[in-house]
A protein has these predicted regions:
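N-terminal leader/signal peptides at the extreme start of proteins
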Residues: 1-15
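N-terminal single-pass transmembrane signal-anchor helix
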Residues: 12-38
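Aliphatic-rich helix starts adjacent to a transmembrane/signal segment
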Residues: 37-58
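Beta-strand-rich solenoid/repeat architectures in extracellular/passenger domains
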Residues: 158, 192, 212, 229, ...
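N-terminal extracellular ligand-recognition/capping segment immediately after the signal peptide
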Residues: 163-166, 183-184, 203, 320-321, ...
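Extracellular beta-strand-rich solenoid/capping regions of secreted or surface-exposed proteins
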Residues: 169-172, 328-329, 341-354, 364-391, ...
């Protein structure tokens, strides 16, 4: 039994280098096997989860189809159907790395694809463009033979060129889409959110949903371009265009330079304005005659309620938002076609505007977060700035209302004229509504080179309350209107006689108010109010 000392020392000896290397190698092999096994297990679990999700999505789609008797028209609609059941596919990526989800519009079902694009669950249509890949890659959009749907939060290119279907989803940062034909003729669906859509595919039939500021139809197959969305203007160079039921289109334009034999237009919606040469066949819609300026018509359709900005066809204004867009619009003719309220002052500087009140009213009611600046509803000024106001209506009820709010050191007038501005009024009603305000107000500076000019040929003018017992219906800012003139040739003024006006103080720094040459004033009394009417002799 006893163990010798030498044997004990031998037993305590550690691993040799070779033995240690072998042990490490064994551990590495075991670790690799474990990791591979774990990853394999994880992938299987993810694939299983993705397949279960796709199955659930398809159950929802099929149930909806059974209940409604219709398939979704777009990928957006399909996604909205499942979203209503609490599943937001729009922001969903498969759990499995490099897998993707597609919507087969022919079968109306979602499909799970692996990293090679092979079907894992569901089916793909044999017609490639009827399959919609859900993606956030502009490279995929522009290079795949499938149609594509852009996931929310897309941060790719703003300008896209495609040869198959595209649905931009809820993204608004795609500002231009150009669709051109591929080798094979097809029927495609395009869905946009604003911006410009250009279609140039003489072998294809194109259906558009969503919205667009402008659609350029350069060429489509004889069967047609179908519009189901909300579009400001469709410019047609060739093809058959159909505005379908439920669509909103402000204007269709056929340039005078195109071959009219290549264009036909049909509109189920009857109030679409069509600008086209006489030879173009229009079925439905409202023929407005030839297009004098395509870009003006597009601008009118995009920013206003139609029109070309000409005297014969003014830009139509039906909302306060449209009225405010006059600020950034060009010189031209504008017409009110509704009573409107604007939430901010309208600046019409350095342009020539003719505004037809057309029997309607425009009133200033400041928005919640809007800070008053000059205080007037309409402002004109700047080099060559000219505002002409008329009322072409039989009723002559067109009215410009100033704000009802009273502010210290602000004159909340109906119209204000600034440096170098010119105002001409031929009709309408003008009302200053705040306490002690003016109706027409001029404010420039002490330099005569900045003088403003106001010429009144007709209309009715009043302020609702006096200032220190006086009504300042027409008014110059004291000491800051050198060389400015307000000349009255016609009109009726409540409690204010422009024929005997004395500007206070009378000095070279304050403008003048006077009657036109040969004009006279008569007056009538109604209770405590006196109305002064100016006429030419």
């Amino acid at each position: 039994g006893n163990i010798s000392f030498m044997k004990i020392r031998k037993l305590k000896k550690g691993f040799t280098l070779v033995e240690l290397v072998v042990v490490i190698a064994i551990i590495a092999i075991l670790s690799t096997v474990s990791v591979v096994g774990y990853l394999g297990f994880t992938k299987k679990a993810n694939v299983s989860g993705d397949k279960a999700l796709v199955s659930q999505l398809n159950t929802i789609l099929k149930t909806n189809e059974s209940e409604t008797g219709a398939k979704p028209a777009t990928a957006t609609e399909a996604i909205q159907i499942v979203a209503e059941q609490g599943i937001n596919v729009d922001r969903l990526k498969p759990l499995t790395s490099k897998y993707t989800i597609a919507w087969n519009s022919e079968a109306n079902e979602f499909t799970l694809l692996d990293e090679e694009g092979k079907v894992v669950s569901g089916t793909l249509s044999k017609t490639e463009h009827l399959n919609w890949l859900i993606t956030s890659s502009d490279s995929v959009v522009e290079n795949t033979t499938y149609s594509t749907y852009l996931m929310a939060g897309y941060k790719g290119k703003k300008t896209l060129s495609v040869k198959t279907g595209l649905d931009v989803g809820e993204n608004t940062n795609v500002t231009s889409v150009t669709y051109t034909k591929d080798d094979e003729a097809k029927d495609v669906i395009l869905r946009t959110n604003g911006g410009t859509l250009t279609v140039n595919a003489d072998t294809d039939n194109v259906t558009h949903y969503g919205s667009s500021d402008r659609v350029n139809v350069k060429a489509v197959a004889k069967q047609s371009y179908h519009e189901y969305g909300k579009v400001a203007a469709i410019v047609v160079n060739a093809g058959h265009v159909v505005v379908e039921e439920g669509a909103t289109v402000t204007a269709i334009v056929v340039p005078n330079t195109v071959s009219t034999s290549d264009v036909t237009i049909k509109s189920v919606v009857k109030d679409v304005n069509v600008y086209a040469p006489e030879e173009v066949k229009v079925d439905g819609g409202q023929k407005k005659g030839a297009a004098s300026n395509v870009e003006n018509i597009v601008s009118g359709a995009k920013n206003f309620a139609g029109g070309q900005g000409t005297e014969q066809d003014p830009y139509s204004i039906k909302t306060g938002e449209q009225a405010l867009k006059m600020e950034k619009s060009k010189s031209g003719f504008y017409r009110l076609d509704n009573d409107i309220i604007v939430t901010d002052e309208i600046y019409l500087s350095k342009k020539q505007i003719t505004l037809d009140l057309n029997g309607h009213s425009i009133a200033l009611e400041y928005g919640k977060d809007v800070k008053p600046n000059n205080g007037s509803t309409l402002y004109v000024g700047g080099s060559n700035g000219k505002l002409t106001i008329i009322d072409s209506s039989e009723s002559q009820k067109g009215t410009v209302y100033g704000s009802i709010n009273t502010y210290p050191n602000k004159v909340t007038s109906a119209v204000r004229v600034g440096s170098n501005g010119t105002l001409e009024i031929y009709g309408g009603n003008f009302v200053g509504r705040s306490e002690g305000t003016s109706c027409i107000f001029v404010y420039t500076n002490i330099a005569t080179s900045s003088a403003a000019k106001v010429y009144i040929y007709g209309g009715n003018f009043k302020t609702e309350s006096p200032s220190d017992g006086k009504y300042f219906v027409l008014n110059h800012q004291d000491n800051a209107t050198a060389g400015c003139v307000i000349t009255v040739y016609g009109g009726t003024f409540k409690n204010y006689n422009p024929g005997v006006t004395v500007v206070d103080p009378v000095n070279a720094k304050t403008g003048k108010i006077s009657l036109g040459e040969g004009c006279t004033t008569t007056s009538t009394t109604d209770g405590s109010d006196t109305f002064y009417t100016v006429t030419r002799a």
